[in-house]
Curated annotation (Swiss-Prot):
It comes from the Bacteria. This is Sec-independent protein translocase protein TatC. Its main location: membrane. Keywords: Cell membrane, Membrane, Protein transport, Translocation, Transmembrane, Transmembrane helix, Transport. The chain crosses the membrane at residues 42-62, 90-110, 120-140, 175-195, 209-229, 232-252. Belongs to the TatC family. PANTHER family: SEC-INDEPENDENT PROTEIN TRANSLOCASE PROTEIN TATC, SEC-INDEPENDENT PROTEIN TRANSLOCASE PROTEIN TATC, CHLOROPLASTIC-RELATED. Part of the twin-arginine translocation (Tat) system that transports large folded proteins containing a characteristic twin-arginine motif in their signal peptide across membranes. Forms a complex with TatA. The keyword Manganese does not apply. HAMAP family: TatC (MF_00902). GO terms for biological process: intracellular protein transmembrane transport; protein transport by the Tat complex.
């Protein structure tokens, strides 16, 4: 009776990318990939800051322009302008590197998502970016000039206004970021409608309340009793809410069609 030596078959290891795509990558592999992508993001940020360092002065000039042609903020401390300069370089560098950093983040998480989730991400990111940039443009070209004109000259007959560059940049960046986030309202409400937190009918019933809120926000941005300026500020916010109602109706309709098909 003859016996044959059987050699056990050795399973070949899958490449990391294929294993990840199939959801078979071990925990250690995920940590290694996360570390690599994080390192790439940090390198991109450092390079972005280095590039932005050479453009910090024009950027500061661009941000002070809404104050008017004769406006020139003061340096109230020895290190004040230097602090503003490096902060602007850091944030501008982050903005320059953000597309690559976002790509690294998406590349890490997308293999774990299903088809619908991937589709949502690739639609949502451009939409969110465009809306935020629209908010920044509205703040810079529409909201800031009249707001700064009032704030900088309020009390000229009583006090001498000396505006520090650091204080000025803080006010301007807060208004820019605030309006950039406010312009994300349609997307946020659309997500809430998709989750069933709000409905188109509920949003429509709160329309009058939002009009009041829009004028309150406009009054905070531009503290004046001029109805024209108030309407210019509040108008886009009201339009954003109407867009939110329309988007929520689309989401609700699609959600109903999916449930009926099941």
């Amino acid at each position: 009776m003859s016996s044959k030596n059987e050699t056990p078959e050795v399973e070949e290891e899958e490449p990391p990318e294929e294993a990840k795509a199939k959801g078979k990558m071990p925990i250690g592999g995920h940590f290694n990939e996360l570390r690599q992508r994080f390192t790439r993001g940090i390198i991109a940020l450092v390079m972005g800051v280095m590039v932005a360092f050479f453009f910090a002065t024009p950027i500061i000039g661009f941000l002070t322009a809404p104050g008017g042609p004769d406006f020139k903020p003061a340096q109230l401390g020895v290190m004040e302008y230097a602090s503003v300069f490096f902060n602007v370089s850091l944030w501008a560098g982050f903005i320059i590197a953000s597309p690559y950093i976002l790509y690294q983040l998406i590349a890490f998480i997308t293999p774990a998502l299903n088809r619908n989730e991937k589709k949502f991400i690739f639609i949502a990111i451009p939409a969110v970016t465009v809306m935020f940039l629209a908010g920044l443009a509205f703040a810079y070209y529409v909201a800031l000039p009249p707001a700064l004109n009032i704030l900088l000259h309020w009390g000229d007959d009583v006090v001498l206004t000396v505006v520090g560059i650091k204080d000025y940049m803080n006010v301007v960046t807060r208004i820019l970021i605030a309006l950039g986030l406010i312009f994300e309202t349609p997307f946020i409400i659309m997500v809430l409608a998709r989750l069933g937190v709000v409905s188109p009918q509920w949003l429509a019933s709160k329309r009058k309340i939002w009009v009041v809120i829009a004028f309150v926000i406009a009054a905070l941005i531009t503290p004046t009793f001029d109805p024209v300026n108030q309407t210019i500020m509040a108008g886009p916010l009201i339009v954003l809410y109407e867009i939110s109602i329309w988007l929520s109706k689309l989401v609700y309709r699609k959600k109903r069609e999916v449930s009926e098909s099941k």
